């Protein structure tokens, strides 16, 4: 018989005070004005389809499917879709946290094409719970958000 055993301590390397502020799933259509805006929370922006640009503090960045953009609070940004390949994306607003990046910017764009199955799974799970609103969905959403943040901190 082969067995693997794992034990866990009560000490956690970090605690999260993250609170799900809002969440949206969008498909770009011609009526979106792409107006630069800010939020009082951190925004996780995951591109599920299409391509376009992300404007962050007057800098343009190309984005496409399986890119994750993390924007800390109070940073001006907006998305701009390409008509030939319209953007579909998830946004998750998270209160109580902000990220520190190696280059000391207040945002980061990650190419997640190699790890997309893991991150996209958490975004899909979160939105499935929010859509269906089955008993206990709020708790599942909180835990899914905690797992997503732990994955991002790696």
Regions from the language model: what does each represent?
Residues 103-152:
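Amphipathic alpha-helical segments enriched in hydrophobic/aromatic residues interleaved with Lys/Arg
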Residues 95-105:
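Short peripheral tails and domain-boundary helices/loops at the edges of structured domains
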Residues 52, 74-76, 133:
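Short beta->alpha connector loops
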């Amino acid at each position: 018989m082969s067995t693997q055993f794992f034990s866990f301590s009560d000490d956690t390397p970090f605690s999260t005070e993250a609170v799900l502020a809002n969440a949206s799933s969008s498909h770009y259509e011609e009526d979106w004005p792409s107006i630069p805006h800010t939020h009082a929370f951190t925004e996780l922006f995951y591109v599920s389809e299409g391509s376009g640009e992300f404007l962050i503090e007057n800098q343009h960045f190309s984005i496409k499917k399986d890119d994750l953009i993390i924007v800390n609070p109070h940073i001006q940004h907006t998305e701009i879709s390409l008509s030939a390949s319209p953007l579909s994306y998830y946004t998750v607003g998270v209160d109580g946290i902000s990220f520190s990046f190696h280059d000391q910017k207040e945002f980061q764009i990650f190419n997640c094409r190699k790890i997309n199955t893991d991150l996209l799974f958490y975004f899909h799970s979160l939105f499935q719970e929010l859509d269906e609103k089955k008993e206990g969905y709020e708790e599942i959403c909180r835990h899914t958000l905690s797992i997503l943040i732990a994955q991002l901190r790696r």
